[in-house]
Amino acid sequence: MTTAVWPLLKSRRFAPLFVTQFLGAFNDNLLKSGLAIFVTYRLAEQGGTDAATLVMLAGGIFIAPFFLFSGASGTLADRVDKAKIARWVKIAEIFIMATGAAGFALESVPLLLLALFGLGTHSTVFGPIKYALLPEHLVEHELVAGNALIEAGTFLAILIGTILGGSLMQVDNGAVIVGVLGVAVALTGWMSARFIPLAPPRSATVARPRLI
């Protein structure tokens, strides 16, 4: 499998998807980690705020879209060009991270939780897309390496995003840095998504997606 990895990482059939997925997973965890530190330390210092409850609430808010929209996301991937959906999702991510940046700048927990829900929805929609795109653009003997790279990249992005988000929040103006970095990463993810080759739906007879 090792011999198949490097050609894939240099191929337009795979590299833009890998970069897009990596940056999306990084942003998810950058914001989650930054929010956890913000709530735990900054708001707890002010008193009257149950930081532990807010952190648990944040986790639930991020996960909720997976339960609410997973079915619709899978159906959408069968009806619309998957590469186009990826681009739409990445445009949405820019606005989501801008909301998060505003939440950090204004020290607004509601805005941060709204951004977190948006990122959960972003991940819910993009999840089926990334796996559906692999067999569209890779030949059969490349699929194992492609899936392995996506999984490895995702876990690495989670690790880096979690560590960096927590670390940056502890420096001067860390919240602003996290917010600006999140928007910059979202912009980069959108640019990489534009290079994903088109993948039109194979069937136009799939039922319209339902939210739940």
Q: Can you annotate each of these PLM segments?
A:
Residues 1-212:
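Alpha-helical transmembrane-bundle signature of multi-pass membrane transport and export proteins
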